[in-house]
């Protein structure tokens, strides 16, 4: 088995987390139709947890098909707000509407990671975190979206907790890493047990 991994994600924050943890990896972005997969799963009544897990597996499987002997890490994150999955905002107005809907309320982020090797899944984990958004004013939310659009357009829920988005919240119950989109503690434990990283 290889001593490095392929990250089947173009996420800068996931790459940064792995790099800072000293993991030897390279990026090989998976080209999958996430919207089609998500729509089909929602139509079948799949849970948000299962949707996150299936999307992460689809990415790992896709890249593993090209590099079967490599260890491939696929990841995905979904946001469950009152039974509805929120996606990355399509424009500033949608970002603002998402934030206004969530203020003063609780939502859940589910971060899935799946490792594939030899065309089969070896490990998987779905971490979850519950967040409560503060009652921010319309004026603040409008200026927040305007200031941060280039960054938050790539984030489910239209915020990044590692940036100014931290000001939007009153409570976070769960791992900060799951908010960032990668269950790092569980992943590091698995990679250590497999001899991929030193323990």
From Swiss-Prot:
Belongs to the Maf family. NCBIfam families: maf. It is found in: Cytoplasm. It catalyses: a ribonucleoside 5'-triphosphate + H2O = a ribonucleoside 5'-phosphate + diphosphate + H(+); a 2'-deoxyribonucleoside 5'-triphosphate + H2O = a 2'-deoxyribonucleoside 5'-phosphate + diphosphate + H(+). Keywords: Cytoplasm, Hydrolase, Nucleotide metabolism. One of its GO terms (molecular function) is nucleoside triphosphate diphosphatase activity. GO terms for biological process: nucleotide metabolic process. One of its GO terms (cellular component) is cytoplasm. The keyword Glycosyltransferase does not apply. InterPro entries: ITPase-like_fam (IPR029001), Maf-like (IPR003697). Its EC number is 3.6.1.9. It comes from Ruegeria sp. (strain TM1040) (Silicibacter sp.). This is Nucleoside triphosphate pyrophosphatase.
